Amino acid sequence: MIWFKNLMMYQLQCPLEKDSSELEKKLANFAFIPCGPQEKVRVGWIPPMVSHKDTLSYQVNRQILLCAHKEEKMLPASVIKQELESQIEKLEAQQKRKLKKTEKASLKDHVFYDLLPRAFSRFQKTWIWIDTIHQMMILDASSTKRAEEALALLRQSLGSLAVVPFTFKHPVEFILTEWIRSDNLPSGFVLMEEAELKSTLTEGGTIRCKNQNLYSDEIALHIKSGKKVTRLALEWQESIQLILNQDLSLKRVKFLEVLREKNSHINKKEVAQCFDADFVLMTYELTELIKNMMSAFSRYPE
């Protein structure tokens, strides 16, 4: 099972399809197919669980797991440029004249599609976890662009998809700054020694610190001068470590050994059982973490 490492979180505005067989049909219409010789990119669904190759969604306890698979042919610009220059030189020598701008553009397209079948492929998986109980959608994606690509595929598959990022009355960076300034973190959270602080001024600076006591006088001075905390390393319930960003994304999520050991009694050879147990454990713990975090942001006083 893939333990999520980077979380992009969204709120579902409308419930998803409850009929699992209907969901499977919709996903099957957009199942992953490898790139053809003249295709640069292909995106589609693959089975989340290798041992269940006929199922494009994994569902348990009203939690759904999907896996978007992307193949992208990689053609370095330098390779295209080198081949294009060679072709231009060859044609100009044959025709004893300089090629026009439009002719060069047309030739560039020809070179691109001639090289494409020989290009190597880069593959990328983006995991989507849908919590139908709390109407949340969590993507294991390191960037907004990657998350949006997977959401676009899901929207295309379902016909519609109404999701929005979580929002709060106060900016996240304001709350993170107050946590440090007041030495008053929400219950369950412990401050670690890594953060990023940015000035609110247009030409202001950025401070990135590691192995730094965030309650030190040095950090206090940065906050007093107007800098806001935009990234903050935290530990939750002695089980999960993470970096919380001002856009509410969670980076470098690490499930500590004390948490993973809860499923250590399961025989690793029982792949399906291990997958099921790990998914249930991960989704339960992350749900509690997110609820704890969202509650802290929502209750923040004026």
UniProtKB/Swiss-Prot annotation:
The keyword Cell division does not apply. One of its GO terms (molecular function) is double-stranded DNA binding. One of its GO terms (biological process) is DNA recombination. InterPro entries: RdgC. One of its GO terms (cellular component) is cytoplasm. It is found in: Cytoplasm, Nucleoid. This is Recombination-associated protein RdgC. It comes from Hamiltonella defensa subsp. Acyrthosiphon pisum (strain 5AT).
